[in-house]
């Protein structure tokens, strides 16, 4: 929202005094703030033409489990509630949500326009919607990046690629039996939409056998774990790889879908501890760590070659050392969130890819949209305009592709646009 404010002011010439910015830490405070603004604006504005030149840009505050927060503030969480809930907290939440919806509907009835960002509101249709990446899309994106990097289409059942999926969620306990697992479920749905054909054809397998050819999109719990503590992430991976049984014989691993950068960082730390060596750069012989650094600093471009097939297991004792060395090669690790703290691992190849919203483009798009809504109201000639069904109604939307980021495009996607500096990338 702050980015949009700057774009509205700097790129469109709107005066700072005509822009009001409010922030809130929860839905209750936000609904009160929006309600107060709308009522005060209506009471303080006599002419309907002035109201028609007012646009509210609202990013509804979503309450979510801690594991969902690991994806950052921009991942989509649709806001729903039960008006007839018996639980007091749920009643308060429903009241706050309904207050926000009522305030926005009142604004629209008075001629104001409403732009909703990321999180939809149950039963409410805005004038404009700005969707962010949903859980299913995040899962699908990472799975596709993994499939492409490992060239699973060229794999065979004789030498399947070994893949683990670590799906973080908040396990319900006695104090919180109502923990929402929908984000984790939809994340796996997106992952499995991409990976299922390869597991069925025998081109992919799971060393831990948590995923098999008979796995369905509903079997998310088979790969889910409580990610509330870093040590839990590491112990889950070690258990999957049977590291507690025999550290001297590493398990061959081609790829890990970590779901977000917080998990990816802990996965990389544990793999390092378990003796895995190299980096994802080693999977493509034409890319070295120095080559990655040179590319980011502008000295040369990267070239890609095919991913080599994993070595087949040898039955000869004489080849055991060679097998162990091959098995201990660093796998592809995916994540999401583009944490600044994860950038050094992207550069050194410990984490192959991450992803994030194109925030600068979205902020600029929102700014242009607000000015158009307050003037001509015509949006059709803007290149980023699309349409989608929101709460049963066809709504105009803003569309920007999610940025998939790896070492070979980090300079173009993050450094040149100014999201991060060379120092942030550890250079």
Give the label of every model feature segment.
Residues 58-73, 90-106, 191, 215-343:
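Hydrophobic alpha-helical
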Residues 176-179, 309, 338, 358-427:
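Hinge/cleft segment of the Venus flytrap/periplasmic-binding protein
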